[in-house]
Amino acid sequence: MKKYKFFAALAAAAITFSSCSMDTEPYDQTTTPYTNLKGVETGLNGAYQILAYYPFLGNYAQTMGDFISGVSTGSSSSGHFYSYSSFTFSDTEQEIEDMWNYGYKAISQSTEAINSANSLIASGAISEEEKPTAYLYEGQLYTMKALANWYLVNYFALPYSAANASTPGIIV
């Protein structure tokens, strides 16, 4: 019996001391600029993924208006969006912060890919037959960037009027 306890303690110690390292690089960050059209396509796919992620257009940004207006109601048992349905939310709610962060992540990713596509086209790194595809990707990226800005303005900026014309809307 002592043998089993010894091996169990040894196995537990081995598992404990062989845990994963916290010194990892973020997997969604690029350290080098895009060097070809495939890189721009990868940036485009990344922008789509960020835009459709649940804290932004995958859930929160699309449903927030429904909950705040009373079209939908949050469940008190799950707590999901309940504070918005009952008008007891604050400006520090996690959903609001996530919408802000992922909106700007989508804008940043789109801008990075647009700038890379433009520099590749200007430098001649993209061939003439690839240019229509590059322009197609660029158009999609501009659309995603505009959509993300539109949602951020709708949720976080003041309504435009002559009285607040000098007040900034969102950070551009």
Question: What spans do the regions from the language model cover?
Answer:
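Membrane-proximal, proline-rich intrinsically disordered regions
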Residues: 4, 20-66
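A structural signal for short, hydrophobic/glycine-enriched beta-strand patches
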Residues: 38, 61-91
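Sec-dependent bacterial lipoprotein signal peptides
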Residues: 1-19
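Secretory-pathway/luminal and periplasmic proteins that interact with or process carbohydrate-rich
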Residues: 52-57, 73, 148-159
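Conserved, well-structured interaction surfaces
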Residues: 80-156
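Short, flexible helix-coil linker/hinge segments at the edges of structured domains or between repeats
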Residues: 161-172
